[in-house]
């Protein structure tokens, strides 16, 4: 099943998000910058956006190129590798833990289990370009690397060229044990008292306020709405995952 059908909790395409409340919205961010998607006391997830600037609309067309997941003292990278020409048989998903590449056999159901972090695993859900990353009791992230098709680029003026097929990530998220104060572009929708301020009746509801979600880097936890506490997370994390 495509991850974009695993609602709620997705970020797909020019990124549209489906929150925990079931509402879908766009958050465009800015190309070559990182934004916090989920920020909680013991978990922080940033997305780095890639894209092209569209002169007619005056904004960037953006997609999620990589995720930076911080928990305890660990940094997990899940990214899409750039390709001039898309080959569905070639793997474009890159996963690394604390800077060390995760090596997965090129076969469906191939599985890697971390020796450093108890409960952390990566499983291929296809021979290439699709993985599920799970930290038991905390999160499951399903990531597919996908290109922009010639047809999509023509219809939406995305600006795909022969030098770049705009490979990006479509992502589905499942979380366990988030606190009531969780924040971030997607994370806020998991609050028990969350009330959407989006114009849901609009054809393309857009979440603004990019500045408060902007992070200084893929693994930075310094966005204005950050709830992550590194020391508390590192101290408490050993009880469930390391």
Where are the regions that the model predicts?
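Von Willebrand factor type D
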Residues: 2-242
């Amino acid at each position: 099943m495509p991850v974009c059908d695993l609602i709620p909790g997705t970020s797909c395409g020019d990124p549209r998000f489906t929150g925990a409340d079931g509402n879908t919205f766009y958050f465009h961010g800015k190309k070559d910058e990182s934004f916090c998607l989920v920020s909680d006391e013991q978990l922080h997830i940033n997305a780095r956006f890639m894209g092209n600037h569209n002169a007619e609309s005056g904004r960037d067309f953006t997609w999620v190129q990589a995720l930076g997941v911080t928990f305890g003292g660990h940094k997990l990278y899940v990214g899409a590798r750039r390709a001039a020409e898309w080959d569905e048989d070639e793997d474009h998903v890159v996963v690394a833990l604390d800077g060390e590449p995760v090596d997965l056999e090129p076969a469906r159901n191939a599985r890697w289990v971390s020796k450093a972090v108890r409960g952390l695993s990566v499983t291929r859900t296809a021979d290439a370009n699709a993985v599920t990353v799970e930290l038991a009791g905390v999160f499951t992230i399903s990531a597919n690397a996908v290109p922009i098709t010639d047809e999509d680029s023509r219809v939406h003026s995305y600006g795909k060229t022969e030098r770049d097929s705009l490979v990006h990530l479509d992502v589905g998220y499942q979380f366990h044990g988030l606190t009531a104060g969780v924040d971030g572009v997607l994370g806020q929708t998991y609050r028990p008292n969350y009330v959407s301020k989006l114009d849901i009746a609009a054809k393309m509801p857009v979440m603004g306020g990019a500045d408060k979600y902007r992070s200084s880097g893929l693994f930075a936890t310094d966005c204005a709405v950050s709830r992550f506490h590194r020391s508390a997370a590192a101290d408490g994390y050993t009880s469930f995952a390391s």
